[in-house]
Design a protein with these regions (language model features):
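Conserved non-catalytic scaffold segment of RNase H-like nuclease domains
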Residues: 47-188, 198-199, 223-234, 240
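N-terminal accessory regions of nucleic-acid-interacting proteins
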Residues: 1-64
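Acidic two-metal-ion nuclease catalytic site recognized across multiple nuclease folds
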Residues: 38, 48-57, 230-232, 243, ...
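Buried hydrophobic packing segments
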Residues: 182, 186, 211, 249-253
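Short alpha-helix plus adjacent loop in nuclease-associated cores
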Residues: 205-221
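Short linear loop/turn motifs
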Residues: 126, 204, 240-249
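Short, surface-exposed basic-aromatic patches at helix termini and helix-loop junctions that form
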Residues: 191-193
Length: 287
């Protein structure tokens, strides 16, 4: 099974769940590689990361871009050393709030040459449980602020105070290569540390690799890495730290959305999936 993205139009990225050969346009040119879901694409190391496709998603949403820096690339054994996230307001001219923290890790850090975070800073950083709690508060604060901005009268204020978490605007969490790495690494770490991941059950997830496939990467030498997209869209990128990558990814996606006269959330809606966290977490526990 594959999620095929036929390209971007003013109606959004045209995607469908199907199987078969690669998708080509009317001239036979390759438009997009299939984004594979389930056991063939979304995986924890060598295990499947179970996903549930979203058939229809048109409600209010709040978009965040996430990035992790880690001790290595093996989600089954490496650990998070930095967690960052940036809110993407509906107005692309607005900056949006940002969250960033270094995280204490005990695994051997083989990726210092990538992120450049000193061992002393990692050793003195908050543990993952503390960082995760702060991250959840950051997301919830943005949700409440968004609700507050949409309510005016005193009666609406009372209604806002009685809202259940399930009634908040949907959190849409985007990451580049997120299905294979960032989301998988995050869930692995939460399960390993015996922490709750129930909030993630209410969120939707977008892997922006699918966007790269939809818009085509032939002009970038076939490279779909974030660094290639950044260079291809003339976006400045600082040192490879998590928050810098979040900012760069937001700029790339906003640039694509603007070029098609669309809002960023509308651009990404067709790519949103739910992660079957219970099934995936059960697989983590068997490794």
């Amino acid at each position: 099974m594959a999620l095929r993205c036929a390209g971007v139009t003013r109606k959004g990225i045209q995607c469908s769940i199907t199987s078969g050969s690669r998708l080509t346009d009317e001239r036979g040119r390759l438009v997009a590689e299939p984004l594979r879901l389930g056991g063939s694409y979304c995986r924890f190391h060598a295990r499947p990361f179970v996903t549930r496709c979203v058939e229809h998603f048109d409600g209010p949403a709040i978009l965040f871009f996430l990035d992790l820096e880690t001790t290595g690339v093996d989600v089954a054994s490496d650990q998070i050393v930095e967690l960052a996230c940036i809110h993407a307001p509906s107005d692309p001219r607005a900056n949006g709030a940002a969250f960033s923290t270094v995280v204490r890790a005990t695994a051997e850090d083989t990726a210092f040459h990538v992120h450049g975070i000193e061992a002393q800073e990692i050793a003195a950083a908050p543990v993952l449980s503390s960082a995760w709690a702060r991250f959840l508060r950051f997301v919830e604060d943005i949700q409440m602020t968004t609700i507050q901005d949409c309510t005016d009268s005193e009666g609406e204020e009372e209604d806002r105070l009685t809202l259940l978490p399930s009634e908040f605007p949907t959190v849409l969490l985007a990451a580049h290569n997120g299905i294979r790495f960032d989301f998988a690494m995050l869930l692995f770490e939460l399960v390993r540390h015996g922490m709750t991941w129930s909030a993630l059950d209410r969120w939707l997830f977008v892997d922006t690799l699918a966007l790269a496939q939809a818009i085509g990467v032939s002009n970038l030498g076939g490279c779909a890495k974030l660094q290639c997209l950044v260079r291809g869209h003339c976006v400045g990128l600082q040192a490879h730290r998590a928050l810098d990558d979040c900012i760069a990814l937001r700029a790339v996606v906003q640039g694509v959305a603007e070029s098609y006269g669309m809002g960023v959330i509308d651009l990404l809606r067709p790519l949103a999936v739910r992660l079957d966290l219970a099934a995936s977490a059960a697989q983590v526990c068997t490794m």
